[in-house]
UniProtKB/Swiss-Prot annotation:
Its cofactor is Zn(2+). Coiled coil: none annotated. Catalyzes the attachment of glutamate to tRNA(Glu) in a two-step reaction: glutamate is first activated by ATP to form Glu-AMP and then transferred to the acceptor end of tRNA(Glu). The keyword Zinc applies. Monomer. It catalyses: tRNA(Glu) + L-glutamate + ATP = L-glutamyl-tRNA(Glu) + AMP + diphosphate. One of its GO terms (biological process) is glutamyl-tRNA aminoacylation. This is Glutamate--tRNA ligase. It is found in: Cytoplasm. Its EC number is 6.1.1.17. It is an enzyme of class 6 (ligase). Its main location: cytoplasm. Binds 1 zinc ion per subunit.
């Protein structure tokens, strides 16, 4: 059993495309089948290698590995010509010489008459030998198919056009190439966005004209943005790699994409194995799904919190390099990540907090310094107690802070806040006892002294 993902390389891998790829990938895994990647690059003017690279990068980051491909339609032009020749020889296609001007007049006349705009078959019986090639669509009968998601769909052939299958420059069009490719690649289930549903009856007629077995069709509901408009490449932050750059885990994005139109009870978080086990195409909603950035962020935070340190480190490395953060031998980076995973919503946040454990600073936040470093007495007392500690552990550090509070008869905050600022430079240090332990005694005392001397 095979499914496929067939993007056009005219831009990055975006949210809608990634969800289509995910559902096709999951379907293939569930069927113990194969997932095929095909690059539909017949639009020679708009297709480009940079977009191909972006699509492959996005799929690699998401972990959507393909079993076959990537196949490129531009490598298969001879095959398409062979099929077109067959259709021409069998009078199931014909050459058309109608000019753009004639077609424009026809278009305007049909609109004036309140009729559906479609080609009138002017060249159908002329037996021409040149021009664009049109498919000789049946004039009578119905095209009926059962969409796995949307149910039975019926279209009268009178509503369909004699579509162009070869352009004037000799390049094949989408509706021809997709039929030939899905047949040759033995695709059993065509999973794609519902913006393709109007093409399906045309493609079914092509299948039947060629005497080929029909695959199943499953058209996914559209994804709406927060303003209710259809999510598209023109909306901000829809590129998959934008989410990598913003610090989202790939499994968080995959989990969220799976829930855009599909659900299993009230369960919010799934492993990929669970998605494969529980997923059913027929369970996908027909109604559009809404993309909610806040929900994705919430999900990312949950998955960071429950992820393994090893997985977080694998994904964090890119962000550390991106922020020019060098990890030295001490403190142990695994221990730092284990502490931070309970605090951070994104890996960008985590990388920012990792910095204070490995990179020294020579200034303090000016506003916080005016507030917390006016009276150096608490820090001087704390420095003395911490310097005397023989065992540098969080519990002992916390106890030293409490002792200073007791001896000076001040609140915990009067010691804790200056200490937090001293450790981090910006006051964003979380649990000061744990941070101080991880930073290490020498570095913690050095930063305390700098705060006292400031």
């Amino acid at each position: 059993m095979k499914s496929r993902f067939a993007p056009s390389p005219t831009g990055c891998l975006h949210i809608g495309g990634a969800r289509t790829a995910l559902f096709a990938w999951v379907w293939a895994k569930k069927q113990h089948g194969k997932f095929v990647l095909r690059i539909e690059d017949t639009d020679l003017e708009r297709s480009n290698q940079a977009s191909v690279d972006a699509i492959l990068q996005g799929m690699n980051w998401l972990g959507l590995d393909y079993d076959e491909g990537p196949f490129y339609q531009t490598d298969r032009f001879n095959r398409y010509k062979q099929v077109v020749r067959q259709l021409l020889d069998e009078k199931k296609a014909y050459y058309c010489e109608c000019s753009k001007e004639r077609l424009q007049i026809l278009h305007e006349d049909l609109i004036k008459q309140g009729k559906k705009v479609r080609y009138d078959g002017c060249c159908r019986d002329k037996n021409l030998n040149d021009g664009v090639v049109r498919f000789n669509n049946p004039e009578d009968g119905l095209v009926i198919f059962n969409d796995v998601i949307k149910g039975q769909i019926s279209i009268n052939n009178k509503e369909l056009d004699d579509l162009i299958i070869v352009r004037s420059d000799g390049t094949p069009t989408y509706n021809l190439t997709v039929v030939v490719d899905d047949h040759d690649m033995q695709i059993d289930c065509v999973i794609r966005g519902d913006d393709h549903i109007n093409n399906t009856p045309k493609q079914i007629n092509l299948y039947q004209a060629l005497g080929w077995h029909l695959p199943e069709f499953a058209h996914l509901p559209m994804i709406l943005s927060s303003d209710g408009a259809r999510l598209s490449k023109r909306h901000d932050a829809v590129s998959i790699m934008t989410y990598r750059d913003a610090g989202f885990l790939p499994e968080a994005l995959l989990n969220y994409l799976a829930r855009l139109g599909w659900s299993y009870g009230d369960q919010e978080i799934f492993s990929m194995d669970e998605i494969v086990k529980l997923f059913e195409l027929k369970s996908i909603n027909k109604a559009p799904a809404s993309f909610n950035q806040d929900k994705l962020l919430w999900l990312n935070q949950k998955i960071i919190k429950n992820s393994s340190v090893e997985n977080l480190l694998n994904n964090l490395t890119w962000h550390l390099q991106n922020q020019a953060i060098t990890i030295t031998n001490a403190p142990n980076i695994e221990a730092v990540v284990q502490y931070l995973q309970n605090r951070c919503k994104t890996l960008v946040d985590m990388a920012g907090e990792v910095k204070m454990f490995y990179q020294d600073f020579d200034t303090f936040d000016e506003k916080l310094a005016k507030r917390y470093l006016k009276d150096k007495t608490p820090l001087k007392h704390l420095f003395a107690k911490l310097e005397a500690l023989r065992i540098w552990k969080a519990n002992n550090i916390k106890q030293a802070v409490k002792e200073v509070c007791f001896e000076l008869n001040i609140s915990f905050g009067k010691v804790g806040q200056p200490f937090r600022l001293a450790l981090s430079g910006n006051g964003n240090a979380g649990s000061i006892d744990i941070v101080a332990e991880l930073v290490g005694k020498n570095k913690a005392l050095s930063r305390l002294k700098m705060a006292i001397d400031s």
